[in-house]
Structure formats: C-alpha cells, structure tokens
C-alpha cells in the first residue's frame, strides 16, 4: 500500500467530499422490491439462526456452506464459489462475481466476517440464536456485528446476478472465520495462503463505520481511515497460599484487585491525530450546546491547557468520544484460587487495551507496569493465538490507505441520497477488524457499514443485540447502488 501522511489523506479526501456537497439535488436511487426485501430478510434470519460462535456448539462452516448453496443454486459457477480453510469447523466462503469480459481493472473485495461472539440465553430477553422481529427491530446475536452486512451483501450479489448485471471488473465477497478471536483461520489465512482469491484494488469492510444517529437525527457518516491496535495483557499475582483459616497479610486476590482499582482510576493521556481532529471538526458543526463548545475547545486550545483538559473531561463521559481521545485499557476477565478453603496461590486478570495509533503494545505493557505500581505483579502480553510472552510486539497502527476517488465519490453520493445532508468523514475505528491483514499486505481498506444506529444503542457483543428494521432496508439499497457504481456498467 502507498503510504501517505494524514494531512495528505485528508486533503485528498476533501475533493470528492466537497464535490458531493455542492452537487445538484440527488436523483432517486433504485430500491429493493418487496421480493428483494423478502429474500434479504430470509437470508438474515438464516444466518442469525446458525450459531457461528467459537464454541463446541458453533460452526462458521455451517453458515458458509448455507450461503455457498444459495450461490450455487442461483447459478454462480462452482469455480467461483470457494469453501475453504485449515479448520473443518471454520471454513471461509469466497465468491467471485466475474466481469463481463477481459478487464485490466483489479477486483473490489467486500470483506465480512461470519463468526460472532458467544451469547448466553440466560442473559437475554429473547433467544440470541433465534431471529426475532419486535417493535421495529430485529433481535439476535450478530444483528449489529455483523451478519446484517453479511446478509445484505449476499442478497445484493444474488439480486445483481438474477438481474443479469455485467460488471466491468470482478467483485469479490469474502465471508470469513475468526475475526472475533481464534487462530487465524479467516482473513489472515486467506491473505497468506490464497492471495489469488482475495487480491483486490481495494477493500470495503462493513465491520466498521456507519451512520451515527442522535435521537433520530442523522449526525455523521463515519468511514474508517485507521484503527486502534488490539492488545491483551495477563496480570498475575502470586502467593505461597495456605489454609483459609489462617489468612496472611499478603493475599494474591487483594493485591490483584488493588492493582485493578488503580487501572480503573487511570486515564491514558488525551491525544488527537489528523483523522480524529477532522472527525471532531465535522462533528462540532452538527452538535449543539456544551458538546459543540467542548469539541471546538479541544480543537483550538493547546493540548494539556486547562480549557482543553476541562472540555476533554466532559466529553470523555461519553464512551464513544472517550475512546477517540486516548488509549483505553479495561479488565475483562478474572480467575483466582483453586479451592474454597485455601488461600489463592495465583490470581489473574485479562486486561484488554485498544491502543491509540503511534503507540506499540510493548509501550503500553511498560505503562501498565507503572500504573499498577506493584513489583510483585507480572504483566505479560497475550497474542491473538493465546500465547503468553514477557514482551509485546512493536506494531504501532494500521497505515491509513490513500484515498481513492472511485471509493469516496459513490460512497458519499449514495449515502447522502439515503440520508440527505449527512457529512461523510474519516474516522479512527476503536475496535479491531480484519482490515489490518490486508493493509499489511498492501491492499487499501476502508470501513463502512451503511448501518444507521443510535449512539446509545450500540449492542454489539452485548445483551439483546438488535438492529432497526429500516436500517437494514437502507443498507440493502446502499450496497446495491454502490456495487453497481464501483463495478461499472
């Protein structure tokens, strides 16, 4: 991938975005028919009701095979529908919609993951693996992350094929395993072992970005331009232990919890980069009152000044803003002890960090040692494959891709036709996505889901995950028009 500085990225982004801002009134976009919607809903339901968790009950292969059957039944050539992977239970599906004839244009890849995080029936008001429509929402594990986009893109590929669409370049859809965790049977494996199947001019990854709503008001359309680095750390306290009837003054559990209290009270330093600065500049124009004033203050005041610090503190009360300002680290799992009547000899916590670009996992590991301030604690790095090591990698961030007009012009035009007047702005993704593997392989990746969600209704990975029905229909219309725009003809 061509490396560019953030200012160059934003300058280049300004051209297509400004062109769209002054364009004439949008003409009506083609929309999905009732039959198209019915098929898309059926596919969505089917995917939600196939458990694709990384558990003994889950199977990504079952979901991939179900979609493979749909493509083959629709008439896609078998040589263009690939079910493959190193793990029999975690097979990926790669489908190629071929160009009408010889072409010099490289393909476009739409990258989606099929796996979802575990959900317990006891935690939900509905069965997480049953597709439930209620009060204008679809409920089920994966309705936000990210089977809605899986289903929308599968149905769009099928619709275009049914309509006899003839693109000028190949369009590729990859439905992958192990994005939510595992041992790299998914996107990383495809890039390393089958580059020929997924090689592309650029990638659209719907696992990031989307439309932010505030009580029904359209605020901004986010397009991922970079992302934080995901890192896990194992914090361990040890002790000789003993009989619980004779407590010791030192205690592994107490020492670990005291250290975690320090972490809970700590805020990593406030930071902005050019992507987040542009994001808050655009957002300040949409916000009102104190929120807008605080955004303008953090942009104008020198970092660390009283004005900037006070504004950042107020904005940080909103988790989505806070995570755009700094590295975040939070305890996510605890384990301790071996018997109810014995003092714990070991207490461990997993601390999950999302690292602001410009900092490495090893730098944060060393910072955690200082924050916890207890030489008796061990702070180790946990790799994505679960390997625990004393030191961490030095990977600092996903390199932002060079902006491509053929991506941003149709993306902006179609988005603003569906959500009139919404500003389209580059953002930093606070989660982690499979885009990193393609970025490291030199393939530009952009994150955009075309899903509209209320800021306070982000339920991905959480209880009662749900998606507004209308948001799903709009994503169908977006992908249909976007695929035709980037595919040509």
Which functions belong to the PLM regions below?
Residues 137-138, 144-222:
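Acidic/histidine-rich catalytic neighborhood of metal-dependent amide-processing enzymes
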Residues 36-44, 63, 67, 149, ...:
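Stable alpha-helical elements in mature extracytoplasmic
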């Amino acid at each position: 991938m061509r490396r560019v500085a953030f200012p160059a990225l934003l300058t280049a982004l300004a051209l297509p975005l400004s062109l769209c801002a002054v364009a004439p009134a949008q003409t009506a976009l083609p929309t999905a028919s009732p039959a198209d919607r019915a098929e898309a809903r059926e596919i969505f339901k089917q995917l939600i009701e196939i458990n694709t968790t990384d558990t003994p009950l889950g199977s990504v292969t079952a979901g991939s095979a179900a979609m493979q059957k749909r493509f083959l039944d629709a008439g896609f050539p078998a040589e263009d529908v690939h079910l493959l992977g190193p793990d029999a239970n975690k097979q990926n599906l790669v489908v190629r919609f071929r160009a009408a004839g010889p072409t010099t244009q490289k393909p476009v890849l739409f990258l989606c993951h099929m796996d979802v995080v575990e959900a317990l029936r006891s935690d939900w008001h509905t069965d997480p693996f049953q597709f439930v429509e209620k009060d204008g929402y679809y409920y089920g594990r994966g309705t936000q992350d990210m089977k809605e986009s899986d289903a929308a893109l599968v149905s769009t590929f099928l619709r275009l094929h049914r309509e006899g669409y003839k693109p000028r370049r190949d369009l590729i859809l990859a439905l992958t395993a192990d994005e939510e965790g595992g041992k790299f049977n998914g996107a990383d494996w495809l890039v390393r072992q089958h580059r020929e199947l997924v090689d592309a001019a650029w990638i659209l990854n719907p696992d990031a970005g989307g439309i932010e709503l505030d009580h029904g008001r359209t605020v901004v359309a986010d397009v991922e331009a970079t992302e934080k680095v995901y890192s896990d750390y194992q914090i361990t306290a040890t002790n000789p232990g003993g009989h619980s009837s004779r407590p010791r003054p030192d205690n592994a559990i107490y020492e670990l919890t005291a250290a975690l209290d320090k972490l809970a009270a700590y805020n990593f330093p406030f930071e902005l980069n050019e992507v987040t600065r542009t994001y808050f500049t655009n957002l300040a124009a949409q916000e009102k009152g104190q929120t807008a004033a605080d955004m303008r203050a953090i942009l104008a005041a020198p970092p660390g000044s009283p004005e900037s610090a006070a504004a950042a503190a107020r904005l940080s009360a909103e988790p989505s803003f806070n995570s755009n300002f700094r590295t975040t680290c939070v305890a996510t799992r605890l384990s301790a002890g071996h018997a109810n009547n014995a003092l714990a000899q070991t207490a461990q916590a997993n601390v999950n960090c999302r690292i602001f670009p410009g900092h490495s996992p090893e730098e944060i590991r060393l910072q955690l040692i200082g924050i916890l301030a207890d030489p008796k604690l061990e702070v180790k790095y946990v790799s994505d494959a679960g390997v625990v090591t004393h030191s961490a990698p030095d990977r600092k961030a996903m390199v932002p891709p060079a902006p491509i007009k053929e991506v941003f012009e149709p993306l902006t035009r179609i988005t603003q036709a569906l959500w009139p007047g919404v500003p389209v702005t580059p953002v930093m993704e606070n989660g982690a996505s499979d885009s990193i593997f393609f970025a490291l392989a030199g393939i530009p990746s952009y994150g955009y889901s075309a899903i509209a969600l209320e800021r306070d209704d982000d339920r991905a990975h959480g209880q009662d995950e749900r998606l507004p029905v209308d948001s799903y229909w709009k994503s169908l219309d977006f992908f249909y028009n976007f695929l035709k725009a980037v595919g040509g003809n």
